[in-house]
Amino acid sequence: MDERVRAIEQLASRELDLLVVGGGIVGAGIAEAATAAGLDVALVDKGDFAGATSSASSKLVHGGLRYLRLGDVGLVREAHHERRVLMNIVAPHLVRRLPFLFPLYDNGPYRPWFVQTGIVVYSTLARARLNGLVDVERARRLVPQLQPRGLRACALYEDAWTNDGRLTLANVRAAADRGAIVLNGAELASVQPLEVRVDGNVVRVRARRVVNAAGPWVDHVRRLEDPAARPSMRLSKGVHVVVDGGDHWSAALTIPHDKVRVSFGVPWEGMLLLGTTDTEYTGDPDTVPVSDTDVRQVLDEAAVALEDIGPVRATFAGLRVLPGGEGGTASARRETVFSTGPTGMVSVAGGKLTTYRRIALDALGHLGVRGVSRRPRPLPGATGLDRIDWPVELDSATRAHLLHLYGSLAIEVLQPAVDDPSLLEPLVPGRPDLRAQDLYARTHEWARSDEDVLRRRTTAWLAGAGIRV
């Protein structure tokens, strides 16, 4: 029987402990934690797993230097703890340490002594060795495109980067490996009665608890339970631009624009990721446009600290879920809001990629789940990274790429290529992804379309527009 058909039948027949609505990083993290606690779980998403915010972030796992400036020391401390856990235990193949430079220009918003003090405090909270000021010559060795004109010095500190979509998928895989029903293209249709619309049919679901982790759609789901529910959040649009470059960078760049906003230049997947914008968004979360004005803003802000920016290869936009309130989105607190509706459905709004594990554990607490272990668990592929017996011959760059995306599960990805060497051909020109990854995405990772494969399960989309499998 087809795996998807089997999952739909199980959704209709099993009596569940928990239905998780939303397959972004928070929903996937909740499903992972709940299955580890022994719960019978179903995870559904109306689109694809990591189909929205969770594949459209700045790709950073970080303490949040700007949150220290806003006085949110608790959030910074918690985020740094989670960064270390993700790097060292949960997903060391996906979450990797990266130095960051914070340039100090003559006309910049901060004085060097202020930044140096902040970096020392930040690095102390991070338990990191890198902190303090470096001269222009060393900074230019780390970031060759750094604009030297007017540059007084750079602060140096440490954070981490990731592939956000694959981190989300690893959590989905962990939940599925423990028996969770996982279905993308499955939308919550009703709360009372509890029904899910999937493949043109409406399936009645029996679940003792429901958690709404629908990200930008969290209030839409709340209104299915209570049409009079007041808004719990607001949305902020973040646009990123991917350009050529970054392959010779040994550090990322944090560019201050005023005393609230920064933007980033991050060497990522062989490219350079620039961004992000932060503007209030009141449109349809299903279609978040990237305008020429958005792209121009990102490039202009990057040019404050970079010279010779390469050609644009891709753009994308995502939505941050922020607590409701007054004031600009850039200064809004990145906190998580939990609410419980009249039928007992718990809704989770907001949060950070870095702290998704903490949010998941807190959500289970709000659901009344007791005895949940807070000990971090390695995700699938996170162990045995130094003991991989590669089943086929590959160059070192391709091995490194697969090891990053899949960890030790790269062996599973490559196994069919033992009998079919054509699977070792490039998936698209100019990227290290292989045809074997396309097959694996469709047979093991719930990919239902070319976009699912190219955009969220591989890095093939970085080859440019018009790419098809």
Regions found by a protein language model. Give the residues of each.
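Flavin (primarily FAD) binding-site architecture
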Residues: 212-227
